[in-house]
Every structure is written in C-alpha cells, then in structure tokens.
Regions:
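Short, low-complexity N-terminal intrinsically disordered segments enriched in polar/charged residues
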Residues: 1-32
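Residues at structural and domain junctions
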Residues: 11-12, 35, 58, 94
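A solvent-exposed, acidic/Ser-Thr-rich amphipathic alpha-helical stretch
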Residues: 23-87
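A beta-strand edge to alpha-helix "cap/lid" segment located at domain peripheries
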Residues: 58-149
C-alpha cells in the first residue's frame, strides 16, 4: 500500500473509532507524544486526548465526522495533511445538535507499526447549534434503532 493510501486509511480509522467509541483502537491511531489543537482545545499527549474524548463523547452522544479533499505531502518518514471536516453531534438527552465544518491540519510519523498521528487539530470555519425542541417532528434514533415508515 502506498503512503498516501495508508495515511488516508489511518484518518478514516480515527474517524470511525471516534464515532463508534472504540477507544482502544482510537488510541492506536496516535504516537504517545501526540499533540492536539481542536480550535484552541489543547492536548499534550495521546492519553490526554483519548481520555478527553472518552469522557466528553459518552454513550448517548451521537457523532458523525467525515473528511474530504485531502492534501497529503509525504517527506520520508513524516507527512502532513489538510482535510476538510464536516461534523455533527446530537445529544438527544439534552435536545441538542451541533453541525459544523473545519479544516484539519495533521502531522504523521512512520513507525514500525505503520503511520501514526503525531499532531492533529482543526480550525472551525463555522458551527451551528440547534435546540431539537425547535425542530418540529424531529425524532433521533441511535445505534440499533430504526424509524419504520
């Protein structure tokens, strides 16, 4: 597999494991000294970043993160990438929904186990929040639930 494909698959695994809350596999996306900057929310290690996500995106928080239009540059055993993010967070218990977009800026390092994230983060281009009570007819179904029409 070429480096750009491997880095793309790593980013997709990061997003899938974040949204499915598979925290051990999520942690495997990073080197221990990973740093993060999510629009000013800073992290100085993999453990701090993963712990924060685990505590702040518990079961019942529905998330969708998608990235598009990668700009990946590989230089030996390091790489950089920019990704266009679209995301949504729904918290039925609080009747809350957030939609937004951002640009991720990532750095990667090649390890004996393959490419890993050395730094990740994004800068928001916009964010919209909704009170679900203000959206008539809204029904939110989580994993395993379906609306039958």
């Amino acid at each position: 597999m070429d480096d750009i494909t491997a880095i793309s698959q790593l980013k997709y695994r990061y997003l899938r494991t974040l949204d499915t809350k598979q925290w051990d596999e999520f942690a495997e996306c990073f080197v221990p000294e990973t740093t993060g900057d999510y629009n000013g929310l800073l992290f100085e290690s993999r453990d701090a970043l993963v712990s924060y996500m685990k505590e702040n995106l518990p079961e019942g928080f529905l998330t969708m993160h998608q990235v598009h239009h990668p700009e990946i540059a590989v230089d030996g055993d390091t790489a950089t990438a920019r990704w266009y993010l679209q995301d949504k967070v729904i918290v039925p218990a609080f009747q809350f929904m957030l939609e937004g977009a951002a640009f991720y800026s990532d750095r990667y390092v090649r390890t004996p186990d393959g490419w890993r994230v050395a730094h990740t983060g994004y800068q928001r281009t916009f964010e919209v929040t909704y009170d679900l009570k203000d959206l008539p007819g809204t029904k939110v179904n989580g994993p395993g639930e379906h609306t039958h029409v």
